[in-house]
């Protein structure tokens, strides 16, 4: 007789006719329509969405979304814009999400026009840093910031505090087709900064770039949840970042640690498959390691 090391058996799930971004991150090649993922799907994780709020009653959230706090100063504890609901859907929607079993938390810092102040954004960030330990997230916490403004040491400092508290932070690189080092929180080194790609595996023409960009993810023509209870297709690095936040929750659910998670995604990502990427920008498309072709 012999005794062999017991292996952990996991269940692989598939979603047919998935949004192209989900299919892309579980495939080696573009053009697929199936999202393949481990059925753990972010169980035991939480995802903070620092944005315009979330329409928490959207059926695609299955009761997993909660409105926590409003720092936008508008007194409206919901999503008056749609942006935050869309982002949340990509992180953790049942149909449109990367991590379909994560818990979603809305921290509102932008109003119905998608605007907010640095002080409000920083207050929301500080709230997340302090609140995370009080939530039931045994496998870990991710934070998504699909927003940005001019370079700000105060915003970057608040972002660094999120990561030093042991939370994974994904941020949009920005949509100015310029170097992301000139905006915040994209320029914060400890954040995982995300540029956008399109269906043809090309860097989106609007995407910011540069040495502060860590990863690339689908961002153009992304279908997700909207604040009217329906769906909408929109584009931006705002849509790319939640693919990374969702993948962060997915990997945490599988037992990865927050420490070094952005580097782990770089390691697991597809290298040099995206066209039109400047030489000083990481050409790494995120991948969950599940898809075969």
From Swiss-Prot:
This is Proteinase T. Residues 19-293 form the Peptidase S8 domain. Serine proteinase. It comes from Parengyodontium album. The lineage of its organism: Eukaryota, Fungi, Dikarya, Ascomycota, Pezizomycotina. The keyword Amino-acid biosynthesis does not apply. Coiled coil: none annotated. PANTHER family: ALKALINE PROTEASE 1-RELATED, PEPTIDASE S8. Residues 1-12 form a propeptide. InterPro entries: PCSK9_ProteinaseK-like, Peptidase_S8/S53_dom, Peptidase_S8/S53_dom_sf, Peptidase_S8_Asp-AS, Peptidase_S8_His-AS, Peptidase_S8_Ser-AS, Peptidase_S8_subtilisin-like, Peptidase_S8_subtilisin-rel. Keywords: Disulfide bond, Hydrolase, Protease, Serine protease. SUPFAM superfamilies: Subtilisin-like (SSF52743). The gene is PROT. It is an enzyme of class 3 (hydrolase). Pfam families: Peptidase_S8. One of its GO terms (biological process) is proteolysis. Disulfide bonds join 46-137, 192-262. One of its GO terms (molecular function) is serine-type endopeptidase activity. Thermostable. Belongs to the peptidase S8 family. It comes from the Eukaryota. Its EC number is 3.4.21.-. The active site is at 51 (charge relay system), 83 (charge relay system), 238 (charge relay system).
């Amino acid at each position: 007789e012999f005794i062999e090391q017991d292996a952990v058996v996991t269940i692989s799930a598939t979603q047919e006719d998935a949004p192209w971004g989900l299919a892309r991150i579980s495939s080696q090649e573009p053009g697929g329509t199936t999202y393949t993922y481990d059925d753990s799907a972010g169980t035991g994780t939480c995802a903070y969405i620092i944005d315009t709020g979330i329409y928490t009653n959207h059926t695609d959230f299955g009761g997993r979304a909660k409105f926590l706090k409003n720092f936008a100063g508008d007194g409206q504890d919901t999503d008056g814009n749609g942006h935050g609901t869309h982002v949340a859907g990509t992180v953790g929607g049942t149909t449109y999400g990367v991590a379909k079993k994560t818990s979603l938390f809305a921290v509102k810092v932008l109003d119905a026009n998608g605007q907010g102040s640095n002080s409000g954004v920083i207050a929301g960030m500080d709230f997340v840093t302090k609140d995370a330990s009080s939530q039931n997230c045994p496998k870990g916490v991710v934070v998504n910031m699909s927003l940005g403004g001019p370079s700000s040491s105060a915003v970057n400092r608040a972002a660094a505090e999120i990561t030093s508290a042991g939370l994974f932070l994904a941020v949009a690189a920005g949509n100015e087709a310029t170097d992301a080092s000139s905006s915040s929180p994209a320029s914060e080194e400890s954040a995982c900064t995300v540029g956008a790609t399109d269906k043809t595996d090309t860097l989106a023409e609007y995407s910011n770039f540069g040495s502060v960009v860590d990863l690339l993810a689908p961002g153009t023509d992304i279908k997700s949840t909207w604040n009217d209870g329906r769906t909408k297709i929109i584009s931006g690095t705002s849509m790319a970042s939640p693919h990374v936040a969702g993948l962060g929750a997915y990997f945490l659910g599988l037992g990865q640690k927050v420490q070094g998670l952005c580097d782990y995604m770089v390691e697991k990502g597809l290298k040099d498959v995206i066209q039109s990427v400047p030489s000083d920008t990481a050409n790494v498309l995120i991948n969950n390691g599940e898809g075969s072709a």
